[in-house]
Amino acid sequence: MSGTIQVDQVSKSFGKKLVLENIHLNIKKGNIHGLIGPSGSGKTTLVKMIVGMDQSDHGNIQVLNQTVPKLSLLQKIGYMAQSDALYGELTGLENLKFFASLYKLNKKEQKERIVYTAELVQLDNELRKKVATYSGGMKRRLSLAIALIQNPEVIILDEPTVGIDPELRVSIWDELMRLKGEGKTIIVTTHVMSEAERCDMVSMIRNGGIIEQGSPNGLKEKYHVDNFDDVFLKAGRKQV
């Protein structure tokens, strides 16, 4: 069965440094797929290529049966980067209005999506403040709202819960599970193993390669462990 997102034999270098090598992914519609690994493992580079912000040196990437990069696909992809791309001199509401205006939403849809996303990330009472006054956690929450503003078919979130308090993290994950139920396809990069365990499938990335893939429960059974951290440790030792 072909997936909503297909990555086939993808490699990427920056100068002489090989960042990703021979990456394969097949992510099905309505799945949450976790990319886990240490900083510098290549997770962010991979999601940027899936979005179409970077191009691979070798291999092919398809999203919704279209080869990336493709400008029209951005209407269907919600992307939250690791570093917040926000306008500090504007208010939270003005940021949401600006990004909503980039998509094919009528005025009524824009208003509804702004209300929904602001409430989801618990910023509805902070929207009149300038983003320059926001804390780091508030900026992450606004970035997440922007990633969801156009009701995208594909949602790609790079470390979405960094700097967010535990209660809101639970709320965000509950919403991701609801979106999954609507048939949205979601990629999440994370260092947090408890979050990885909520994914349908995970790919463990280390030194530019995928060292293990599978469902969280399947991987725990394979390595005969109860703790998902131990899966990553054992898979890493196997690579060496």
Task: Name what the model sees in each region.
Residues 97, 101, 108-126:
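Conserved ABC ATPase "signature" region
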Residues 51:
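Helix-to-loop junction immediately C-terminal to a conserved catalytic motif
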Residues 59-75:
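Conserved ABC transporter NBD signature motif
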Residues 213-214:
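ABC ATPase "signature
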Residues 155-159:
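Catalytic Walker B motif of ABC-type/P-loop ATPase nucleotide-binding domains
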